Swiss-Prot record:
Protein name according to UniProt: DNA ligase 2
Compositional bias ranges of the Basic and acidic residues kind: 1-11, 733-750, 785-797
Annotated spans, Disordered: 1-32, 715-797
Gene from which the chain derives: ligA2
GO CC term, one of those recorded: cytosol
Native organism: Nitratidesulfovibrio vulgaris (strain DP4)
High-level lineage: Bacteria, Pseudomonadati, Thermodesulfobacteriota, Desulfovibrionia, Desulfovibrionales
Annotated keywords: DNA damage, DNA repair, DNA replication, Ligase, Magnesium, Manganese, Metal-binding, NAD, Zinc
GO BP term, pick one: DNA replication
């Protein structure tokens, strides 16, 4: 359903935080204070952490933290950006939907971007949302369409002349994975729409789910066949749709539940609905199943009553849900309210409290990570929480164990907020028998028996033995993991087996393995061994500097910091020579991060590893940018500090590669056309972004001139001969090619005229005014007044 998945940001700006474009309503005497360095560093670290957890959750289906922990990190970042607005960045998880599309399936752009909803966790937050809505639109109607917030895989199915033609996963909101063949096997998905009034083209958005009873049967079949059990229905649904072998998908009990539409192209006439409830009725007439329990609520109080009633019955429902989605039913009011940069101002996800269960804390085991951090893990008597069997939960550190007062043998309360990773909430002290025992944190590493230390100011205990087998094992696993070099086809279990067996003692050792070496292992046949070696060789020759820096596992250096370093230094030699002062001149790098980088390169063992990597040819250079001078000059780039945006079809390279080249030249990549944009680079059929940039007086550069500028490392002066692109007329662009609009996620097109219909809140489009009636002006999502005029396309929700 909506992209508000289990409290993940991309989707979940807390409702009591003002939306981006309402920032002026929030006043604080300290808004313009100088930003302390520690605040800048903390914001950068939070962004990196949130982006990583977004990727683990949305793309890899392997979350490492609970929703509650994620929400704490997210709200902390929101608070920092509110306290110091200059910290706010368009690439921040608080400003955009996160996540990148996985490799392995064909990728395709959504006609209209799929956005998300803000959320609320209490009645006060629901009331604050309503107050903001009525402040913005005093005469807003009070009826809301409400339905359950399902926990599945969001995607879009497309119909041409009533016939199913394609399907895309949500992906990163702009580009999804093509899963047409898999979706054809979903039994309740109509392959042809019913009725005579079907649109010429329609994009229907919804959620793929597996019912609880079907999930239990699926896992029973998996167990009987000796297969891997699924953690929860969401993971099973997501994995089933992404199968390349559609016979596997066909054997899975998937359902598609429609909740809204994207682009709608009509032959003529007027829009077929003017409310969201009307849209839902029309979807059912066309043959779609819609979320169960959906209903129209006449007032905000009725919405809350619906939320409480549904929450009380959630365990008895056929599918897993974790909240309620409430949307203003009237589409004209929706358009008047508009959007922030991330979400509609007229819709909200009301989240249920975490589900809880009682169980016994049997033991606490301590694990050692790749940086030597000792992490205590609760070993629980297995218990079902939210449809999933829970037997382990991280306790993070010794301080948390003490703060919660946990003892071995305690009965404890465990919760799982729709996530895979559970949390021990508290001990049930009233049930203690006297047989419980205190837990003593080990003074020696459980893997190598070396003394552990707790550095001053830190909560973590660390094993400082660089030869610790656990540290070595986890470091090598990290090196080839998706968070490191991202070696496809080399699984963690194989790496662990190779390390534990003494066959590999460093990351370099993996690259020296031969097919014959690997075939000595049980279940490693000729084909698997060949694929293993091929994958490693492809990673070695195709590695980027960003991925290698990530793979090294330098403390405090996540992917965002790695991108910054890779954009400003030619290779690891140049980075090694940079002193702390030079490093701190780079964005988001403060004394702590700079010190960590210098410490890494001062270690003899690390330097030996780097030389061995160089010897096997794993030594990438910075891509598509001139060599970096030494010292402080290393941060000077032709696009240094400029905000750049690409639009239209690029012919020389793909969009992602072009953005990487711009970053390497010092640019920050923007997500939309705003007054703060410095440069718009246009390819073929640029559409409305070009028109908007011209209105705002933003510099425009053709694709060829942009790449010529990068190659010469010289930024053309203002008013130079860089040609601008003529603006296309409406007649030159068909309904599929006209870019999406800021205030809408549904576009209805018929015979060059527009009508005034409705749609769904879970997706928003880019780059156009909110409404299109003659005569007056309207505010865009960026807060600018744009004259109203004849609409070539109409927006629905």
């Amino acid at each position: 359903m909506t992209e508000v998945k289990k409290g993940r940001v991309v989707d979940d700006a807390p409702v009591n935080d003002a939306p981006e474009n309402d920032a002026a309503e929030v006043t604080s005497p300290a808004r313009h204070d100088a930003i302390p360095e520690e605040a800048r560093q903390r914001a950068a670290q939070l962004r990196a952490d949130l982006e990583r957890h977004n990727r683990l959750y949305y793309e890899l289906d392997t979350p490492e933290i609970s929703d509650a922990e994620y929400d704490v990190l997210y709200r902390e970042l929101v608070g920092l950006e509110r306290r110091w607005p200059a910290l706010r960045d368009e690439a921040s998880p608080t400003q955009r939907v996160g996540g990148e599309v996985l490799e392995g399936l064909e990728k395709q752009a959504h006609t209209l971007r799929m956005y998300s909803l803000d959320n609320a966790f209490s009645r006060d937050e629901w009331g604050a949302f309503m107050q903001r809505m009525y402040n913005a639109l005093p005469d807003a109607p009070s009826a809301f369409w409400c339905d359950p917030k399902m926990d599945g895989l969001a995607l879009e199915v497309i119909y041409e002349n009533g016939v199913f033609t394609s399907a895309l996963t949500r992906g990163n909101g702009e580009v999804g994975e093509v899963v047409t063949a898999a979706m054809r096997t979903v039994r309740n998905l109509p392959l042809a729409l019913r009725g005579d009034d079907v649109p010429r083209r329609i994009e229907v958005r919804g959620e793929v789910v597996i019912a609880k009873a079907d999930f239990e049967q699926l896992n029973a079949r998996q167990s009987a066949a000796g297969g891997k059990l699924f953690a929860n229905p969401r993971n099973a649904a997501a994995g089933s749709v992404r199968q390349l072998d559609t016979t596997v998908t066909a054997g899975r009990p998937l359902q598609f539940l429609a909740y809204g539409v994207g682009q709608v192209v009509l032959e003529g006439g007027t829009a077929p609905w003017t409310t969201h409830s009307g849209l839902m009725a029309r979807l059912r007439e066309w043959g779609f199943d819609t979320p169960p329990e959906g209903r129209l609520c006449a007032s905000p109080d009725e919405v809350w009553a619906y939320y409480e009633a549904l929450g009380a019955r959630r365990e008895s429902l056929a599918i897993e849900i974790d909240g309620v989605v409430a949307k203003l039913d009237d589409t004209e009011a929706q358009e008047a309210l508009g959007f922030t940069a991330r979400a509609p101002r007229w819709a909200l996800a009301l989240k249920f409290p975490a589900m809880q269960a009682r169980t016994r804390l049997d033991d606490i085991r301590v694990q050692v990570g790749r940086t030597g951090v000792l992490t205590p893990v609760a070993i629980l008597e297995p218990v079902r929480v939210g449809g999933v069997e829970v037997s382990r939960a991280t306790l993070h550190n010794e301080d948390e164990i003490r703060a919660k007062g946990l003892m071995l043998g305690d009965m404890v309360l465990v919760q799982r907020a729709g996530d895979v990773i559970p949390e021990v909430v508290r001990p049930l002290v009233e049930e203690r028998t006297g047989d419980e025992r205190p837990f003593v944190f080990p003074e020696n590493c459980p893997e190598c028996d070396s003394p552990v230390v707790r550095p001053q100011g830190e909560v973590a205990h660390r094993c400082v033995n660089v030869m610790c087998p656990a540290v070595r094992r986890q470091s090598i696993i990290h090196f080839v993991s998706k968070a490191g070099l991202d070696v496809r086809g080399v699984g963690e279990r194989w790496v662990q087996q190779l390390v534990d067996g003494g066959h590999v003692t460093s990351p370099v050792g993996l690259f020296s393995l031969t097919k014959l070496d690997l075939m000595r292992f049980e279940r490693m046949g000729p084909t698997s061994a060949a694929n293993f070696v091929t994958a490693l060789d492809a990673a070695r020759t195709g590695a980027t500097l960003v991925r290698l820096i990530c793979a090294l596992g330098i403390r405090h250096v996540g992917e965002q910091t790695a991108r910054t370093l890779a954009a400003n230094f030619t290779d690891l030699d140049a980075l090694r020579e940079a002193d702390a002062e030079t490093l701190q001149q780079l964005p988001d790098i403060g004394p702590e991060v700079a010190g960590s980088i210098r410490t890494f390169f001062a270690n003899e063992g690390n330097l030996e590893l780097l030389e061995r990597l160089r010897a096997i040819g794993l030594w990438p250079k910075r891509q598509d940018a001139p060599p970096a001078p030494e010292g402080a000059d290393a941060i000077v780039r032709p696009l240094q500090g400029l905000k750049v945006l690409f639009t239209g079809s690029l012919t020389r390279v793909g969009r992602t590669e072009a953005e990487d080249m711009a970053r390497a030249a010092g640019a920050n990549i923007a997500s939309s056309v705003t007054k703060s944009l410095d440069l718009l680079v246009v390819g073929g059929k640029p559409g409305s972004k070009l028109e908007k940039a011209r209105k705002l007086g933003i510099r425009v550069m053709e694709e060829a001139d942009f790449f010529a500028m990068l190659e010469s490392a010289e930024m053309p002066a203002e008013g130079s001969d860089a040609a601008e692109v003529p603006a296309p007329s409406v007649e030159d662009v068909d309904a599929k090619e006209v870019p999406s609009r800021d205030v809408a996620h549904v576009r209805i097109v018929h015979d060059g005229t527009a009508s005034d219909p409705g749609g769904d809140s879970r997706s928003v489009a880019e780059d156009a005014p909110a409404r299109s009636t003659e005569g007056d002006a309207v505010s865009t999502a960026e807060g600018e007044d744009v004259p109203r005029g004849r609409a070539e396309q109409l927006k629905l929700f």
